Swiss-Prot record:
Protein name: CDP-archaeol synthase
Assigned keywords, A-Z: Cell membrane, Lipid biosynthesis, Lipid metabolism, Magnesium, Membrane, Phospholipid biosynthesis, Phospholipid metabolism, Transferase, Transmembrane, Transmembrane helix
Membrane association type: Multi-pass membrane protein
Top-rank EC class of the record's enzyme: transferase
Compartments where found: Cell membrane
Signal peptide range in chain numbering: none
Organism: Halobacterium salinarum (strain ATCC 700922 / JCM 11081 / NRC-1)
Pathway assigned to this chain's UniProt record: Membrane lipid metabolism; glycerophospholipid metabolism
TM region(s), chain numbering: 7-27, 55-75, 80-100, 128-148, 150-170
UniProt record similarity statement: Belongs to the CDP-archaeol synthase family.
Catalysed conversion reaction: 2,3-bis-O-(geranylgeranyl)-sn-glycerol 1-phosphate + CTP + H(+) = CDP-2,3-bis-O-(geranylgeranyl)-sn-glycerol + diphosphate
């Protein structure tokens, strides 16, 4: 597979994990997952991690995977690339894993004294990818092995931070986020 094909497959395969956190920001709010509880004088997660945001984010990622499966034949023909279909387990684990990764990073932020919205370089950009891929590898190891070869994984690791900063910058410019990272 050439470089363009590798990038296309990497982005396609990760879209169900890329979308959930954006959807959670747009539709979040409501009751915090941690219920306001603290550990060592610091909130466990903070007000930014809510049940509604997690549910909406996960649903958005799954819905996108369903849509991508429907579009896959036409997209593959148009792009000239073999695109992976998402098995149901991958749909759920990519989307939910992305949310869990972001929640875990929030927990780490609080434990290290960072406030909500504070920058946490590398962790902020890759937390959701690591957990989404790990959960998906547990659920559908053959699919992950077939889809995420080394070139695709490297592409995901390089592209994700740039995409993360770009989308957060756009959300900040639109007034949806309080900080651009």
């Amino acid at each position: 597979m050439d470089l363009v094909g590798t990038v296309v497959v990497a982005v396609w395969a990760m879209l169900p994990a890329y979308v959930p956190n954006n959807a959670a920001v747009l539709a979040g709010g409501g009751r915090p997952i941690d219920g306001g509880r603290s550990l060592g004088g610091r909130r466990l997660l903070g007000d930014g991690k809510t049940w509604r945001g997690t549910a909406v984010g996960t649903a958005a990622g799954v819905a996108l995977a369903v849509a991508l499966n429907a579009l896959r034949p036409a997209a593959a023909d148009a792009l000239g690339v073999v695109l992976p279909a998402f098995p149901p387990a991958a749909m759920g684990t990519l989307a939910f894993g992305a949310m869990v990764g972001d929640i875990a990073a929030s927990f780490l932020k609080r434990r290290t004294g960072r406030q909500r919205g504070a920058a946490f370089p590398v962790v902020d950009q890759l937390d959701f990818v690591v957990v989404a891929l790990a959960l998906t590898a547990l659920a559908v190891p053959a699919w992950v092995g077939d889809t995420f070869g080394l070139p695709v994984l490297v592409t995901v690791a390089v592209l994700t931070p740039a995409l993360h900063l770009l989308t957060n910058g756009i959300a900040y410019a639109l007034g949806v986020k309080d900080e651009p990272w």
